[in-house]
């Protein structure tokens, strides 16, 4: 029989029919020893790595980056998974590594399925009792009954779901009624479990939303602080611009004066005999030198406001902005032109003060009335004041010499007055009167010397209410008359007798000879004319008999009378649709001007002394240390002012609020002790 081995000793590829020879035990042990890892190859590989590392980090080439690299390599080699992979690699011979054939999909699967130990170590510990699959199931909507029935029919005809056969086998041994109950129990248990998962998800969403709200509130506070800083910088820049304008005007005046004092050129004089004859008829040159040149009546320009200040609109409602100790006695009237603008206050201490709401300081005083001012109005830079001396005075605040930043209050005063008294003026005209004395400091007397315009004198008793719009001003007096004034000509153009109008209304409404009053009897302690407002030819007037009369100034007749108040009307204001009135009967009434009926009404515990509204809120002073605020949008009543949070029985901690004014959510209130408070409403 031919040998089954080739000449080179390799087994023949042909199949042999002879039995295989028995392998001796020595050769079997030798083959097993060949399967063990070859340590000599590993030792040689280790020596090569050691030599390479020694050449790289020798004493002559040691660097920080090499040490960092070796440190990172040492940390990587200490990982258990890397050590296991090295040991598994050591157990295989190079032949097996070379001969091993790994498919491309298997390599991709290993690359995608391998997760590093760092990533596994960073997995957060979760105490959630529900799995991810349960959370996914909870997000699925509940199927209607019809879909379930269709699904059952389809599953019965088609391929059953995984686990469906086991459930059917389990329920098949039970009676039909028990099967139905068991399936119903299983379904309800599953729904109950899903409800628990959904509740947990809702709680997690609530916590997440709370965290977002907290972060948003923090961001809002940061942006609000940045907005406040921008508005302060904007105001400072506007004041700097005003100072530069004043310096330019001063320099221009100096240049004009220098040009006027310079000797004229000979060529510039006319040489005609006619001009010489005319010049001889005039005064000599020495007379002209004695006459002082006419000073230019140059008023102070108003501060430029590139944009309206909106900080108060983003503050929390009821936030205190500032407080000014304005007067020594009760506030009788006040008004301001715009938020952070100019405020004018009047008091029983017979003073009228002008305030810069942005800086919180007194600009000056309006002097001229012989008695206390009972009413006033501010419209842009024009101020109208009505006094107990039966006169009405108008003022133009744009003529005031006021520089809020550098205290240069009078540019036309002497140098000694401006320089020597600078510190004294700064102390007198300082901020918020932080001294211990109760008396407010008097501002410089020359600051308002060009402010008065003219005086209206026609009433014979004290002025209790005024209002002007455009060129028309209407005043109400204790002499029981209303007077219409033309501000262009400065004279009275019409007188309206309130008593005559009341008598005419009584005679018209009385069908028989018996007298029936249209309102209540007059209150002797209240003002006969409590409040008025004019717009074009329409005039609204509230009097002490509780009546609100709507006049037509073109005919001088009462167009409509609104009956409802049982006490003197103390405040009123109207817009395009509604008229709001406040009365001593403790009520606030909102009237519909189209129908003359009451649209809404509410009352307080004390008489209403002052009231005003803007686009959203109605604010009132009702004999308390807080301002009563009514939100027209949601119908909510709330309090704003110094008395918020104080005990109801403690009325001595804060003074009673007498007057309120509001514009665009910027609230100013005046108290009985002379203090003025500014709030965000």
UniProtKB/Swiss-Prot annotation:
Start-end of Acidic residues biased regions: 416-431
Topology in membrane: Peripheral membrane protein
InterPro entries tied to this protein: G-protein_beta_WD-40_rep, WD40/YVTN_repeat-like_dom_sf, WD40_repeat_CS, WD40_repeat_dom_sf, WD40_rpt
Coiled-coil blocks: 211-263
Bias kind Polar residues: ranges: 270-279
Gene Ontology annotations for the cellular component aspect, listed alphabetically: mitochondrial outer membrane; mitochondrion
Any GO BP annotation: peroxisome fission
Biased composition (Low complexity): 11-20
One Pfam match: WD40
Subcellular location: Mitochondrion outer membrane
WD repeat copies, ranges: 326-367, 369-405, 458-497, 505-561, 564-603, 605-640, 647-681
Record key words, sorted: Coiled coil, Membrane, Mitochondrion, Mitochondrion outer membrane, Repeat, WD repeat
Main subcellular location of this protein, as a coarse class: mitochondrion
Segments of this protein annotated with the region Disordered: 1-25, 146-171, 259-279, 406-449
General function of this protein: Involved in mitochondrial fission. Acts as an adapter protein required to form mitochondrial fission complexes. Formation of these complexes is required to promote constriction and fission of the mitochondrial compartment at a late step in mitochondrial division.
Family statement: Belongs to the WD repeat MDV1/CAF4 family.
Name of this protein: Mitochondrial division protein 1
Native source species: Phaeosphaeria nodorum (strain SN15 / ATCC MYA-4574 / FGSC 10173) (Glume blotch fungus)
Lineage: Eukaryota, Fungi, Dikarya, Ascomycota, Pezizomycotina
Gene: MDV1
